[in-house]
């Protein structure tokens, strides 16, 4: 979708309907007619991105592997999703806080609530198997999603301060390993550490 490409190119969610129309080759009036307004288009884009990513969560939860293995796969999946859609958290914040209550309710319904529910179920599975310490799902969500957002959005501040470059495939892989170590080091029990090791 042209809107997604523009936000990635510009590292910003500040795009206009005319920018989107020009990028897509469509008429701006047609874009407005189909989505209602820019916020409608952004909501549809986020819903499309979220549907793809969230459908994988049910599949992951059903797999016959340890909760620790599921956790690691989830960490990698979330980071890769942010790598593909680096504007995602900014778009979520915009739609939750700077648009209508209806848009905020929709984002909560199709993104925040299902992801939190997945975290609750995964953490409960790990706790009941003895792999995880008791972990608050809201704090877990905040930690993982916040860390992902900062890598992609906060990268601009880091590049100015330290000279680091853009997020590449290698940086993404390093960050996945780092977050696995950080999160697993915080919530795994000895049984969970044994499951992670082998």
Would you name each region that the model predicts?
Residues 1, 13-14, 34-58, 72:
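An amphipathic alpha-helix adjacent to DNA-recognition modules
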């Amino acid at each position: 979708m042209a809107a997604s490409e523009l936000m990635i190119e510009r590292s910003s969610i500040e795009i206009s309907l005319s920018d989107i129309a020009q990028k897509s080759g469509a008429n701006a009036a047609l874009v407005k007619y189909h989505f209602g307004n820019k916020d409608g288009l952004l909501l549809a884009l986020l819903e499309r991105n979220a549907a793809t990513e969230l459908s994988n969560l049910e599949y992951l939860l059903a797999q016959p592997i340890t909760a620790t293995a599921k956790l690691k796969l989830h960490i990698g999946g979330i980071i890769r999703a942010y790598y593909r859609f680096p504007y995602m958290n900014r778009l979520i914040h915009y739609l939750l806080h700077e648009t209508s209550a209806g848009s905020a309710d929709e984002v909560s319904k199709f993104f925040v609530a299902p992801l939190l529910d997945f975290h609750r179920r995964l953490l409960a599975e790990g706790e009941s198997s003895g792999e995880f310490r008791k972990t608050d799902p809201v704090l877990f969500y905040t930690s993982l999603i916040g860390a992902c957002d900062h890598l992609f959005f906060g990268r601009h501040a880091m590049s100015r301060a330290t000279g680091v470059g853009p997020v590449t495939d290698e940086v993404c892989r390093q960050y996945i390993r780092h977050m696995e170590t950080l999160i697993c080091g915080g919530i795994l029990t000895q049984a969970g550490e044994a499951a992670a090791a082998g």
